[in-house]
Amino acid sequence: MSIYDVFSGGNRPFDKEEWAAAKQAQRKEAYELIDNTCSEMMASGDSFRQYLDVQGRFDRYSVANAILVSAQMPEATQLKEYSKWKASRVYVNKDAQKIIILEPSKEYTREDGTKGISYNAKVVYDISETSAKDRRQEQEPKSMRELVSALIDASPVPCVPVDELELPAYYDSSQQTIFVKKGLSEEVLFVSMAKEVSAAVYDFKYNESRDASDFKSFCVAYMVNSRYGVDTRGFDFSRLPREYAEMDTQAFKGELGTMRDVLGEIQSDMYKSMEKNKPAKNKEQER
């Protein structure tokens, strides 16, 4: 008798081939789910908005993984592997819903000599499916003044208030300036600025004109507003760009990828700004 008989499942040896087959099936399922969800998103404003909500919360997730979370548990807020939850002394419910995402694995060389990265399927669980469901971290509320100030810092161009302007805010690429109309409510100011800052980032990063990036800037603004709890009822996704319905999945994900990158750039700069301007008392409490 071996001492290893005390381990549960000791009578059933680990079958590497069976494990690999299960992982391959999960990976295949994930890619099929991505393609199917993209098809839904290209035709449905509700599905598209649902994806944006997820990508806004998980701004560091790849587009593929945000799509997967959107399809499986769009209300998720904090995802970890079983082992990571356990290491934090948090226990996953027995009947917890599994969410499959993809993680990069090994680099390989394609037949044409270019490099590629293979991906493995990974199972994660949302905090709502664990013993820590009542300990979810609520985002510290930010004042509209803090948010507007951070957005100004995140802008690659100056933001200049003016008395006369047809729109609430407007990015003028020829002057490399965002003009903002005076007298706006705080929320209208933030919402309109978020779109124009996005347009400016698109201009600088992708050399896209304000007109060319209009809808994508609209989407980035929605994600920024959604993340910080600003009212998003004014955003309408009932009519998506006509070209989306004609795109293949890869091209569509490319569009989403630029939105995710612009969002990440704005979020990163806003975070740095708010950390820099955080009251000294709050910084001391965090130590």
Model-predicted regions and their roles:
Residues 1-287:
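N-terminal accessory/interface modules of nucleic-acid-binding and processing proteins
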